[in-house]
């Protein structure tokens, strides 16, 4: 597996492209995205969701151990919106 993958982050109807290392945890990836995107229009409380793939991800999971690859898109969801989204799936 490659040491880096190319992913997109969907925020406010736009997609931002990033090249990220696969040797980091999802928790660290989320922290880095918060630092990079905090100058933009970010919700106060948010979470990342993988678009078009229904997988359960924990903050301690390494990206290289997940079914995530180049071309995947992550959505930034406000925490409240995420809860409503989860309720729809029940």
Swiss-Prot record:
Protein name: Uncharacterized protein CA_C3711
Pfam families, sorted: YukD
Entry-linked InterPro entries: YukD-like
Species this protein is from: Clostridium acetobutylicum (strain ATCC 824 / DSM 792 / JCM 1419 / IAM 19013 / LMG 5710 / NBRC 13948 / NRRL B-527 / VKM B-1787 / 2291 / W)
């Amino acid at each position: 597996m490659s040491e880096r993958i190319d992913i997109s982050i969907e925020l406010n109807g736009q997609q931002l492209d990033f090249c990220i290392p696969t040797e980091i945890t999802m928790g660290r990836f989320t922290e880095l995205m918060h630092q990079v995107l905090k100058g933009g229009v970010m919700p106060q409380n948010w979470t990342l969701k993988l678009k078009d793939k229904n997988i359960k991800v924990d903050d301690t999971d390494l990206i290289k151990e997940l079914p995530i690859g180049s071309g995947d898109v992550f959505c930034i969801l406000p925490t409240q919106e995420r809860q409503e989204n989860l309720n729809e799936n029940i």
